[in-house]
Design a protein with these regions (language model features):
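Histidine-centered divalent metal-coordination motifs
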Residues: 1, 19, 98-100, 177, ...
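Active-site HxH/HxHxD metal-binding segment of metal-dependent hydrolases
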Residues: 1-87, 119-121, 190-192
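Aromatic/hydrophobic pocket-lining residues that form the small-molecule binding cavity
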Residues: 2, 157, 243
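Short amphipathic alpha-helical segments and helix-helix/interface helices
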Residues: 5-9, 161, 247
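Generic beta-strand structural signal
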Residues: 88, 108, 258-260
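Metallo-beta-lactamase
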Residues: 91-198, 204
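C-terminal regulatory/interaction regions
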Residues: 205-285
Length: 285
């Protein structure tokens, strides 16, 4: 999301203003800050990756060199101002909307809302899973980041969508992708946030409908949701990580339980999540 920041700053002489989580995290490679055995689901996710994906992974030297250059440049950028929810900068108002990434913000200007990757037309942003920082990382983070639950996870992302919905219907979104696609503009309003929430509700519906009174596991659940063509090679990991985010949310709402061996079972009626989501889509409930 910030791949051209160093070039832009150099060419424009502009300052970098970013969400307050950006500066303390930017010196780390994102996939190296997570303790991979921090939960039963993430432990299972990485076991499957090690057994079924990594043995067939073919290194891409050019891509790795590009990534290395990016991380080195990012670590050296200076953040001139930390942005927090509710800050006002002239006519702009800052809204913190984590979930797709911890540092995602939206900018309100008149009756427009610049949503970045938080709300997109046509496609749905990938939600983060819950974060458990590695101990060596955690001890160097500011106090407000010690509990990352406010900034990571599907529940956090859905809450951020609900936050936008509370603004009311009179905003037009200006997203980072797909505003103009296939020779046409995709003008959309706040209703798009509701559509994305409903998309995730339908995924949760499918997962629980397939579970019923049976037990399952992460890989079985993933293969039951995604068609085979979308699970080839490294795509399996991306799909499983998205399913992990949904399972974490269902565990938080008390609709499933995760056993010590990674087995997944439905709890009660398995409908608590629907009440939670209904209140996000309609704040007046």
């Amino acid at each position: 999301h910030d791949g051209t920041v160093t070039d832009f700053m150099r060419d424009s002489k502009a300052e970098l203003w970013a969400h307050e989580t950006y500066k303390p995290l930017k010196k780390y490679i994102p996939w190296e800050i997570h303790y991979k055995k921090g939960s039963l689901l993430h432990k299972e996710l990485n076991r499957i990756a090690e057994e079924k994906i990594q043995p067939y992974y073919e290194p891409d030297a050019a891509r790795e060199a590009t990534d290395q250059k990016y991380f080195e440049e990012r670590s050296q950028t200076e953040v001139a101002r930390d942005l927090r929810d509710g800050y006002e900068l002239s006519d702009l108002k800052i809204m913190s909307t984590p979930g797709h990434s911890p540092d995602q913000i939206c900018l309100l200007l008149d009756d427009f809302i610049f949503t970045g990757d938080h709300i997109l037309p046509e496609i749905t942003p990938h939600p983060t899973g819950k974060m458990v920082f590695r101990t060596s990382i955690l001890e160097n983070l500011p106090d407000f980041l010690r509990d990352p639950s406010e900034f990571y996870g599907l529940g956090t992302y859905l809450n951020s969508l609900g936050k936008v919905i509370k603004l009311g219907p009179n905003y037009t979104i200006l997203p980072a992708h797909r505003l103009y696609n296939k020779s046409r503009f995709n003008w959309q309003g706040i209703e798009r946030a509701k559509q994305i929430i409903k998309h995730h509700e339908h995924r949760l519906d499918s997962m629980l409908n397939k579970l019923q009174n049976n037990t399952s596991n992460l890989e079985e659940t993933t293969r039951g949701i995604f068609e085979r063509s979308k699970l080839l090679g490294p795509n399996l990991y991306a799909a499983m990580s998205e399913i992990v985010a949904h399972l974490e949310f269902l565990e938080d709402t008390g609709d499933i339980a995760i056993g010590a061996s990674g087995d997944i079972s439905k709890q009660g009626t398995g409908t608590n999540y629907k009440t939670y989501i209904s209140r996000l889509v309609d704040p007046n409930l």
